[in-house]
Amino acid sequence: MSQSPKVGFVSLGCPKALVDSEQIITQLRAEGYEISGTYDGADLVVVNTCGFIDEAVQESLDAIGEALTENGKVIVTGCLGAKSSASGSNLIEEVHPKVLAVTGPHAVGEVMQAVHSHLPKPHDPFVDLVPAAGIKLTPRHYAYLKISEGCNHRCTFCIIPSMRGDLVSRPVAEVMLEAENLFKSGVKELLVISQDTSAYGVDVKYRTGFWNGKPIKTRMTDLVAALGELAAQYGAWVRLHYVYPYPSVDEVIPLMAEGPFKGHVLPYLDVPFQHAHPEVLKRMKRPANAEKVLERVQKWREICPDLTIRSTFIAGFPGETEEQFETLLDFIREAELDRVGCFAYSPVEGATANELDGALPDDVREARRARFMEVAEEVSAQRIQRKVGKTLKVLIDEVSAEGGIGRTAADAPEIDGVVYVEPATKASKRYKVGDFVSVKITGADGHDLWGEV
């Protein structure tokens, strides 16, 4: 074994799982472990899994198998670690009995305990080698900020609460400290994430915390205002994801539209509507008044005309009729959602939706998903064309001889569109990764933009 023990790491799943991985890696580095980029260079391997849908389960099981084959010493964590097999035993231990240990999600302490058992930590922790912002797996100029864990909802298609538990909000001072450290490290964009961002603080009855001597309620609106104030000091962006459409969201829109936080609290909401017909929403155990949702979307845009709304939907949910599906298509057209993703309903092991009557054939579900995306892409293309001729602020993600690739306030990394920026023709217009630049938009397709500095 090398002088400093080395741990390999495989991170799968969503941004929330990515943050879990970042926290584990940060703790490993704080205790003096080195992170190996290869299996054969590691003394053991940690695999952070996803267990949300069947494809993710198989991907995670395959990754564990590969790590066992290539290295032999594997610790497993993440959502799949909390899943049982048909026999009632732990699924991972049943499929891969040679793993050293298995934990559930957001279990940094348990993972570290397992690492210590099989690979004792070095005597010198090298704390000074770990940046205050922690170890990040994202590019240096943007980072995810997880404000809570778990969810109090029991949507029939979802098993997240059974794996990640009920809502647990992080103390507001802890969140603000992490945000400040990230901005100090050079992060230009914070992406606020959780299972349910709008519910932040519900579990602690919105108790008051303190940050730099100032009281801040453990509540979404108050946290967003505090993050906006902090972001303004660093000329940075704050972007909100996984915003459940509670009435409290109405209070956040003005922060995006006016005042000192405009341009820092981005006019962007990621709101998982899932459907628009009240009967389908009722079967999903989601808010079931689509007319009021449409009114609220229109009101949001009256207050903040630049607002970008991203959402996700499920087509072909059990019992969904053609008429109900057409209602969903009408909603997409009327709400003019900017960015939309859609999944054909897929049964998830353990979800109560599996017990609902009216399961639709695979070809019907997939056909409806395709029809949905055709309408959604048409709406998105119409909205994006309106940006041609405008000058927009762009955060540069990549630079090459062919020019740059960046994103506007309307585009989150990896899931939305990008701006292809022409190479700088003058020294005064040169840019690098992490720079904000003003770009005149010269062209657009259904998803992306083109422009010049």
From Swiss-Prot:
- Please share the entry's free-text remark on the cofactor: Binds 2 [4Fe-4S] clusters. One cluster is coordinated with 3 cysteines and an exchangeable S-adenosyl-L-methionine.
Among InterPro entries, the record links this protein to:
Elp3/MiaA/NifB-like_rSAM, Methylthiotransferase, Methylthiotransferase_CS, Methylthiotransferase_N, Methylthiotransferase_N_sf, NA-bd_OB-fold, Ribosomal_uS12_MeSTrfase_RimO, rSAM
Domain named Radical SAM core: residues: 137-382
Q: Which Gene3D superfamilies match?
A: Methylthiotransferase, N-terminal domain, Nucleic acid-binding proteins, tm_1862 like domain
Every copy of the TRAM domain together lies at 385-453
- GO cellular component labels: cytosol
User: What residue intervals traverse the membrane?
Assistant: none
Query: Where, subcellularly, is it found?
Result: Cytoplasm
Instruction: Quote the EC number.
Output: 2.8.4.4
Q: Name the Pfam families on file.
A: Radical_SAM (PF04055), TRAM_2 (PF18693), UPF0004 (PF00919)
> What's the name of the protein?
Ribosomal protein uS12 methylthiotransferase RimO
Coiled-coil regions in this chain? Answer: none
Please list the GO terms describing molecular function: 4 iron, 4 sulfur cluster binding; aspartic acid methylthiotransferase activity; metal ion binding; protein methylthiotransferase activity
Q: Which reaction does it catalyse?
A: L-aspartate(89)-[ribosomal protein uS12]-hydrogen + (sulfur carrier)-SH + AH2 + 2 S-adenosyl-L-methionine = 3-methylsulfanyl-L-aspartate(89)-[ribosomal protein uS12]-hydrogen + (sulfur carrier)-H + 5'-deoxyadenosine + L-methionine + A + S-adenosyl-L-homocysteine + 2 H(+)
MTTase N-terminal domain spans which residues? 5-120
